[in-house]
A protein has these predicted regions:
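A beta-rich soluble binding module of mature secreted/lumenal proteins
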Residues: 2-193
Length: 193
């Protein structure tokens, strides 16, 4: 009986180790952001200088709110650290076309500017510009319609050739990957930028 209980104890310990190891692996397989890639702190205003317009290509949820959305810079004051971008939301999937104006100013850190939307009735919020290559892509977690939206935005010239490092940073920092731009659904949208 003593040999049997020792074998059972060993088997139990072995199974416990295997089960624990499997539990540790579950978050990696669940689609959650991994936050493993290294990147410098984004300087949002340096990025604003380069990115005068962009289109959302990937979103972290499937609710369709960023489908075919384009942003266009209307104003940038590098000295005062203020910017204004207009979000152009086309009529799509039962959504009425609308424009939202994002007013941005310097925030607590270079990657986290403070913003208000339209007349500012919803108060100040903070955006998190997670990654940019300072050429043609931005990964940003930004307030949109009373919730956070983690997305990959690219310039018009990169829509059909999104740099892999940008996709990698999006996948590393946002929970899911949902395409929100395709030529058929978003026909004519790029004409606005």
């Amino acid at each position: 009986m003593g040999v049997f209980s020792g074998s059972m104890r060993s088997l139990f310990c072995f199974l416990l180790v295997i089960f624990s190891a499997l539990l540790l692996e579950v978050p990696l397989a669940s689609g959650k952001a991994k936050h493993q890639l290294k990147h410098d702190v984004t300087d949002a205003f340096k990025m604003f200088e380069v990115v005068t317009s962009a289109v959302a290509v990937l979103d972290a949820d499937g609710d369709g709110d960023l489908d075919c959305v384009v942003v266009v810079r209307e104003h940038l004051d590098e000295n005062k650290k203020t910017a204004r971008y207009v979000w152009l939301l086309p009529s799509l999937n039962g959504r009425q076309a609308e424009n939202l104006t994002y007013h941005l100013k310097e925030g607590p850190t270079p990657d986290k500017p403070v913003l208000t939307v339209d007349d500012g009735a919803d108060g100040e919020k903070t955006a998190n510009f997670i990654y940019t290559n300072y050429k043609n892509c931005v990964v940003v977690d930004i307030p949109f319609k009373k919730k956070r939206s983690c997305g990959l935005w690219v310039t018009k010239d990169a829509v059909h050739s999104v740099p892999q490092e940008c996709v990698d940073q999006f996948e590393d920092n946002c929970d899911m990957e949902v395409a929100v731009f395709d030529d058929e659904t978003c026909k004519g949208v790029l004409d606005n930028i």
